[in-house]
Regions:
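Extracellular polysaccharide-degrading/modifying enzymes targeting complex plant/algal/animal polysaccharides
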Residues: 1-264
Length: 264
């Protein structure tokens, strides 16, 4: 390297990545001869790991199974597009327990959708914030225990909601089941209508944990607001209630199944 180091000037523009941009030790130089990566401060260089899809490419939803699961208020608004036909990769089956923290090597790269630079959210309940469960019925086993039991708890929303959840194809809860500093998602194995109880497919619930916050997501039964979406993972059909307004004519879908940038 030159004695005064090297500067890599990134030209302005958008750089669409199909894999993680990785920098390792040899890419940094030394403290005396550093390698500096930068763009012109008066211009912008974007690193992009997404696919852009025009809202006009979404078609009316015609799948009778999905339509029957949507709230009536959403049925005339929801439009869809086939990700498989577009060649966009996605996780076809969610595990029984997972998280999406990028700091973890085993983090699940979930599909993310953005509109006008802001994230849109999977159909969920409640639409904002968290609900809370009541009594812990079964502690369950730690997620690392192979073939471990899932925890169970009572939950008393309105009876019709719990009845809809009992018939859901794929019910996922995200919550702080063990600690207030750690949340994760867990598949529901069983909804007991008689006891108003939910049993997780996997995962430990701490009986002494007082917060007990969670929300349900990945549910077409709860798609009831503009900007919410649902992905039918078996056939790749992305269902979206388009956002209100005219801030953008397209949405962007995350493409990578790993970090956008990794520095080792």
């Amino acid at each position: 390297l030159p004695t005064d180091g090297v500067t890599v000037n990134v030209a302005p523009g958008t750089y669409r990545l199909t894999e993680t941009f990785q920098l390792e030790q040899q890419d940094s130089g030394t403290s005396d001869c550093p390698i500096i990566y930068r763009c012109d401060p008066k211009q912008r260089a974007w690193i992009d790991g997404g696919n852009t899809i025009a809202l006009s490419d979404f078609a009316p939803l015609t799948n009778p199974d999905i339509i029957s699961r949507l709230p009536e208020v959403a049925r005339s608004h929801v439009r869809c597009i086939d990700l498989s036909e577009l060649g966009i990769a996605y996780v076809k089956e969610l595990p029984d327990s997972f998280n999406c923290y990028g700091s973890r090597q085993d983090a699940l790269a979930q599909l993310q959708i953005y509109y006008a630079g802001k994230p849109l959210y999977e159909a969920r309940w409640p639409n904002h914030g968290f609900s809370h469960f009541n009594d812990v019925l079964e502690l369950g086993d730690h997620p690392r225990v192979q073939d471990g039991r899932g925890g169970a708890f009572t939950f008393t929303p309105d009876p019709e909601r719990l009845k809809r959840w009992a018939g859901a194809e794929d019910l996922i809860l995200h919550g702080y089941f063990r600690r207030d500093y750690y949340s994760h998602s867990a598949r529901v194995a069983k909804v007991d209508l008689e006891r108003s109880a939910i049993t997780l497919a996997k995962g430990l619930i701490d009986e002494a944990h007082h917060s007990r916050r969670f929300y349900a997501h990945h549910l077409p039964e709860e798609l009831d607001l503009p900007g919410e979406w649902y992905l039918h993972r078996k056939n790749g059909l992305l269902c979206l209630w388009p956002p209100e307004g005219s801030a953008s004519d397209h949405v962007m879908l995350s493409r990578l199944d790993g970090p956008l940038v990794r520095i080792d």
